[in-house]
Amino acid sequence: MINEQLQKKIDQSIRLLQSVQKRYDGEIELAYSGGKDSDVILQLAKEAGIRYRAIYKNTTIDPPGTIAHVKEMGVEILRPKENFFQLIAKKGFPSRFSRFCCEALKEYKVLDKNVIGVRKAESRARKERYNEPTECRYFGAKKEENHVEQIFPILEWTDEDVRDFILDRGLKLAPLYYDTGGANRRYPKTRLYVLPAGIKTQAPYRISEASTHSEGLPACRTEVLRYAS
């Protein structure tokens, strides 16, 4: 399941995390969203042996089952002073030019170092936006207390890399990945959806791990089922 190219990426990701820990004595924040990439970086942090603090910033509008999964993974939950609906009642709906909801609910500093599961393969915008495995940014005004170094250990990972790593490590994902896929279609829980988007063009494949009692497939057989264009 883990080919040579992916193993090199895994090794590089682990070395990156360890290199950050070598030059920083404190805990490293692990930005955990409850998504598949978060589960991957959580596993990598464990394998790297770094001192981390996995944190889920509750936006109050995440998919059903997310909080339960976060708790099951032993991740710390930070709750906002005001939820999403209280914010829009006061300020109206957010836009690309007015992102007050992100600032209030998830884009704020907790620790000096912040590991995020962002990947270039997720979108063209991210491919153009992120060039280095680490970057510095400010949450709020450009003051020292707002400065954070962000680390992207799986920046160069493809969707297939994530899929193969999840299956190889036997990672359990949030319910959303097992319950939905494609255009609001529902499938048996034996299926694992790597991209749970509601539009077919955003979910080019899904992984099926089905028993002999499900559609006649051999036990533990894994196959990639590509959507028709």
What do the predicted segments below correspond to?
Residues 168-229:
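ATP/NTP-dependent adenylation/nucleotidyl-transfer catalytic domains that generate, transfer
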